[in-house]
């Protein structure tokens, strides 16, 4: 369960850097299309830097407050590191570097210029593939980003899609990321993070679900976690999903949020648009089984 591992142990660390990484990124003046690889629930992008002849492998991760470069990759490529920083995470302290200035591109698209360098070796091990970095919420801000899970394409749209009210919900942009409101099992509205770095469908913070109704699943990261699993009914805007696989948490993953919406759910709509400019999360009109 890659998303839980990241959120509980790694991205709490990234959160403290978000305020320093909100420099505006200019929106594309015209639509731009980039290839993605949707593999085992995660979205991969090839990134080029002057220091490497081979492309680097980054995860597209709207749930990360800031973009990250793998410290191991940065050292291997001789990229100049910023000052050491001690980053407090849940139950541990990480050592990283900030800022790490990097001229990075995805094809012809210029990517954020400053990164937090952290050791992502645990994530790489869980993915069975080197994770050289993460494109976080700073990549999405002030942009209209369309993710096509079926065609494995990312498009930066010049303008917000027209006539989206029926298949969209309000998207709130916060310092630490993006969130939307959902109803779980017919309950009251709760805020959850929109997290393209989460491979699973839904992670829910609750103390109400009886333990006897749950199974368990291990999440391996900086530490091993046993995550209770259940099925819930989830309503988001005009959409109601009856049986959503859900990981249960007693403590908040992020302050002010009751969980995460991951690729396991978002991909069911085929196409999802994160319109940070207009503050809308737009779903494809056709559900994909």
Located regions from the model:
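Pepsin/retropepsin-fold aspartyl endopeptidases
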Residues: 24-289
């Amino acid at each position: 369960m890659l998303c839980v591992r990241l959120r509980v142990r790694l991205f709490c660390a990234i959160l403290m850097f978000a305020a320093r990484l909100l420099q505006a990124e200019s929106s594309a003046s015209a639509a731009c299309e980039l290839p993605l690889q949707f593999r085992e629930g995660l979205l991969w992008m090839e990134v080029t830097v002057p220091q490497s002849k081979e492309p680097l492998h980054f995860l597209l991760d709207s749930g990360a407050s800031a973009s990250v470069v793998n410290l191991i990759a940065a050292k291997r490529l001789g990229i100049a590191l910023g000052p050491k920083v001690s980053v407090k995470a849940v139950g541990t302290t990480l050592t990283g570097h900030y800022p790490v200035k990097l001229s990075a591109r995805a094809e012809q698209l210029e990517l954020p210029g400053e990164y937090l360098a952290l050791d992502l070796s645990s994530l790489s091990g869980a993915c069975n593939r080197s994770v050289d970095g993460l494109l976080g919420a700073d990549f999405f801000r002030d942009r209209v980003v369309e993710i096509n899970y079926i065609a494995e394409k990312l498009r930066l749209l010049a303008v917000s899609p027209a006539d989206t009210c029926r298949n969209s919900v309000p998207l709130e942009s916060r310092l630490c990321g993006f969130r939307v409101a959902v109803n779980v099992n017919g309950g009251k509205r709760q805020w959850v993070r929109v997290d393209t770095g989460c491979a699973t469908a839904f992670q829910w913070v609750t103390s109400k679900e009886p333990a006897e109704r749950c199974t368990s699943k291990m999440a391996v990261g900086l530490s091993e976690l046993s995550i209770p699993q259940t099925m819930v009914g989830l309503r988001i805007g005009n959409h109601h999903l009856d049986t959503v696989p859900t990981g249960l948490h007693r403590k908040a993953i992020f302050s002010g949020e009751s969980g995460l919406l991951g690729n396991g759910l978002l991909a069911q709509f085929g196409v999802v648009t994160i319109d940070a400019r207009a503050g809308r999360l737009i779903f494809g009109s056709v559900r994909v089984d």
